Swiss-Prot record:
It comes from the Eukaryota. Belongs to the eIF-3 subunit C family. This is Eukaryotic translation initiation factor 3 subunit C. The keyword Ribosomal protein does not apply. PROSITE patterns: PCI (PS50250). Residues 12-23, 167-194 have a biased composition (Acidic residues). Pfam families: eIF-3c_N, PCI. It comes from Arabidopsis thaliana (Mouse-ear cress). HAMAP family: eIF3c (MF_03002).
């Protein structure tokens, strides 16, 4: 038939009949306008009856079409196409057998195998034709030879029967198909009646398409099939029949073209008709595995509704294990094939393959990934967090089960997951979660499960034995103590290390700095953390950050700076804390590295506030560096406590115009400039204007502590700067200048004298400080310089040896602990005894490196004019303070996995 274009033009070369047909079609198109309701195609075809084919017929048609394509390929000797169609027909066979529930393959498939086998033998016999084949065709022929030989072994008996009597086998096939597909016929009848039943008036105002009704019937087909299975005679549904169906479904898992949700539904239906508790348990394990496969990618997460079903399935597994104590879950020994056929009243042990710990860890991982992917500023994120008690209830029940079974190693792994869900929560958040868990009702989840399972009930009914709600002690500390004690007794090395870090983190969160510090020093985790996995290194970094915040809240400025200094040494805070991806101008990351780093990110509710962390670090550095720079004004670069702070200060001083402070750095730099001039009031006002203080619950007491420390360091800075200008200085005058009580001034100055930071003495009758002039010989100055250089060389050699030996061997770290040069590497008690107790011994007889540095600096001061007491007086103690900061907390570089 010609085109309408020529019809509209009115070509005289066409037949008259064709012209009339085309004109009629054009007229019909004009009448049946698609924008008119009465002109719809569904109403126009009143004489055509819609035919709905059952799924079985559709699958057979697909297989028949593929077989026809194979015949065409045989005619042209195309083995490449033949190989592709052979793989295709094998996949279609699985679908056909699944739908028809037949034991034997259809005759069409056996006939195809016989045809292929004969054709292959002919092709192999014709060697001349084989030589003329192309390379791809020859490879496909050889591949087809192997595939067909392997495949035909599975159907040897059927092939032999067909070769003996092909006509008889073809006659038997329709009868078998009719017997196997009674259920499909009934569903087809229902579909036909639903389509033929409702008639629609073409002139009606509302035109409801019959496709919607058909779609509703198709949706209910699954439920009807299940109902048919449940209404079958129980004698027909045997353990063997269910086991065979179970193996067929499991065999299809992971294959291309298999719908994952459909696979989960099929396995879920099998749990309803399982004949024994062990069989139901075995199928439930496969259901959970299939649910994990719903989202196979690494970037996404399991759908939330599937996650909840997975948790409910695991609780059902625990119900079965608790009720039937003779059933044992084990993944080390392959159970017998007929193990699950043993009845309910069987007294012996029944082994079922499974791993509850692995499943729980996967559930926890999927929950973690969902929080990573959901936008934290939406309601959905908050709703997702409300599911956490559901996971904690599951973990608690699994841990109780393992403890009853005596498997304490597995119980320790489960306890670690519970610890990692609690350690970062303050007591207020813990109380809110505990109240939420008490208010959560189980009816919602139970109703959802009933709706999905449909009206039929299971053959094996398992009551809810294990509780669906978690139980929490009133104090989060009490719960942590119970869990970590179990882990310390029974966990492996990695589990113990992570539990220890979580325990330290929680102690720091609860303001127990001394306990947290002692746990860290006794565990020696800082010496071995570089050998652990990256997630544990991230946990270590988070713990050190929390420990630094705790020390700051307790007023321990030196210790706080020691914990945070390494964290801010490389400008990669976000990366080290897993709170963002850092970008470096010198190191470009591959897309794979970026994806891996994003997968390690912490969820938003677990983030540490970076502004607060930066403020604490810079304030601590300011309180330590300003007196240190005043004490070493002639050689400021020689003794550096915080390189990061010095760099920021240099950048700030190079600016021609200083704008009002905007961010945390600007505020701290402005406070530093004021403190350097001795204006402690302005320094405190600038710091007090920071917004981060509102994040602290005891804000007023912390600000009072900061103000007192600013006054103290302002006093020290003043004495370091102007001691050379005085012969004596009144105690009363110092107290009035810095608004500090006289006993406190006396204590500060006396400590500086004892530590040889200030070369002076007290005149008790007049209550004055008398400054002394110090002069050194040339030999003494050279000796002090040599001592300092030797100490630096020895320390560098120790670090080089330690990096080569991995921190062990010659016990060089213990020597550094004895010298009080490493906070985090200190031994329990001795080396890390903080500034107050360590400085006394270090000033005169302890740390030779600090002493030597002070003497050398003093001599330099003497050469430059021998100011009164200025050279020697303020050097040694500041040297000691600097040495305490070295190598402090052993933060870990995640890119290289070594200490930075």
């Amino acid at each position: 038939m010609t085109s309408r274009f020529f019809t509209q033009v009115g070509s005289e070369s066409e037949d008259e009949s064709d012209y009339e047909v085309e004109v009629n079609e054009v007229q019909n198109d004009d009448v049946n306008n698609r924008y008119l309701q009465s002109g719809s195609e569904d109403d126009d075809d009143t004489d055509t009856k819609r035919v709905v084919k059952p799924a079985k017929d559709k699958r057979f048609e697909e297989m028949t079409y593929t077989v026809d394509q194979m015949k065409n390929a045989m005619k042209i000797n195309d083995w490449v196409s033949l190989q592709e169609n052979f793989d295709k027909v094998n996949k279609q066979l699985e679908k056909v057998m699944r739908i028809t529930e037949a034991v034997k393959p259809p005759t069409l498939y056996i006939k195809t195998l016989v045809m292929l086998e004969d054709f292959l033998n002919e092709a192999l016999a014709n060697k001349e034709a084989k030589k003329k084949m192309s390379t791809s065709n020859s490879k496909a022929l050889n591949s087809m030879k192997q595939k067909l030989k392997k495949n035909n072994k599975l159907y040897e008996d059927d092939i032999n029967k067909y070769r003996e009597a092909p006509e008889v086998e073809e006659e038997k096939q329709p009868e078998d198909d009719d017997d196997d597909d009674d259920d499909d016929d009934e569903v087809e009848d229902d579909d036909d009646s639903s389509i033929d039943g409702p008639t629609v008036d073409p002139g009606s105002d509302v035109d409801e398409p019959t496709d919607n009704l058909t779609w509703e019937k198709m949706l209910s087909k699954k439920d009807k099939l299940l109902e048919k299975l449940m209404n079958k005679d129980p004698k027909e549904i045997t353990w063997d029949w269910v086991n065979k169906k179970f193996k067929e479904i499991v065999a299809a898992r992971g294959k291309k073209g298999t719908a994952r949700f459909e696979l989960v539904d099929q396995l879920t239906h099998l749990t309803k008709i399982a004949k024994t508790p062990a069989q139901k348990l075995e199928i439930l394990f496969s259901v959970i595995s299939a649910q994990f496969d719903v989202n196979p990618g690494l970037s996404g997460h399991m759908p939330i509704n599937v996650w909840k079903k997975c948790v409910l399935n695991m609780l059902t597994i625990l119900d079965i294990l608790v009720k039937y104590s003779n059933i044992v879950v084990d993944d080390t020994v392959e159970p017998d094939e007929n193990e699950t056929s043993k009845p309910t009243d069987y007294d012996g042990k029944i082994r079922v393959w499974g791993n509850l710990v692995a499943f729980l860890e996967r559930v926890d991982t999927e929950f973690f990934k969902s929080l990573q992917c959901i936008d934290p500023h939406t309601r959905e994120y908050v709703e997702r967090l409300r599911d956490e008690p559901m996971f904690l209830a599951l973990a608690q029940n699994i841990q109780d089960y393992f403890e009853r079974m005596g498997d304490f190693k597995a119980a320790a792994k489960v306890a670690l997951r519970r610890v990692e869900a609690i350690y970062y929560k303050p007591q207020e958040v813990y109380d809110a979660m505990r109240k939420l868990a008490e208010l959560v009702e189980e009816e919602e989840e139970t109703e959802e499960a009933k709706e999905e399972s449909g009206p039929p009930t299971s053959f094996i009914v398992v009551p809810e034995v294990v509780p669906r709600k978690p139980t929490f002690p009133e104090s989060s500390r009490a719960m942590m103590d119970i869990l970590v004690s179990l882990i310390y007794r029974n966990g492996d090395e990695r589990t113990k290390a992570r539990a220890m870090l979580c325990d330290i983190n929680h102690h720091a969160l609860m303001d127990n700095f001394v306990t947290a510090r002692d746990l860290l020093l006794m565990s020696h985790l800082q010496d071995n953390i570089q050998h652990m996995d990256i997630s544990t290194q991230i946990l270590f970094n988070r713990t050190m950050a929390q420990l630094g915040l705790c020390a700051f809240r307790a007023g321990m400025i030196t210790e706080s700076h020691s914990c945070l200094s390494e964290l801010y040494s490389g400008q990669r805070v976000r990366e080290l804390l897993a709170q963002g991806v850092s970008q470096s101008r010198y190191h470009e990351k591959t897309p794979e590295q970026e994806r891996m780093e994003r997968r390690r990110q912490m969820p938003y509710h677990m983030h540490l506030n970076l502004e607060l962390l930066e403020a604490v670090h810079l304030i601590c550095a300011m309180l330590l560096e300003v007196p240190n720079m005043a004490a070493n004004s002639h050689d400021a670069k020689r003794r550096v406590i915080s390189k990061n702070f010095r760099r920021l200060l240099e950048i700030s001083e190079r600016q021609a115009f200083t704008a009002p402070p905007e961010n945390v750095r600007d505020h701290v730099m402005a406070a530093t400039r004021a403190l350097t001039k001795g204006d402690f009031q302005k320094a405190f006002e600038v710091l007090n204007s920071l917004e981060v203080w509102r994040l602290l619950k005891n804000r007023d007491s912390i600000l009072d502590m900061v103000k007192d420390r600013i006054k103290e360091e302002a006093l020290r800075t003043y004495l370091f700067t102007y001691s050379s200008s005085y012969e004596s200085l009144s105690l009363d005058q110092l107290a009035k200048m810095f608004d500090v009580s006289e006993p406190q001034v006396h204590s500060i100055v006396s400590k500086m004298m004892i530590n040889e930071e200030l070369h002076a003495s007290w005149d008790q009758p007049t209550r004055c400080i008398v400054f002394h002039e110090v002069q050194h010989s040339r030999l003494q100055s050279l000796a002090f310089q040599l001592t300092e250089k030797l100490s630096i060389l020895a320390e560098s050699n120790e670090r080089a040896m330690e990096s080569r030996t991995g921190g062990g061997g010659l016990d060089l770290s213990s020597r550094r602990r004895d010298n009080n040069q490493d906070y985090a590497g200190a031994a329990s008690g001795g080396g890390g005894y903080w500034q107050d107790k360590a400085n006394y011994g270090q000033g005169r007889q302890g740390n030779r490196s600090g002493y030597g540095g002070g003497r050398s600096s003093g001599q330099n001061g003497q050469w430059s004019g021998q100011n009164r007491g200025g050279g020697y007086a303020g050097r040694v103690g500041s040297g000691n303070r600097g040495m305490q900061m070295d190598g402090s907390s052993r933060m870990v570089s995640l890119n290289r996995g070594v200490r930075t």
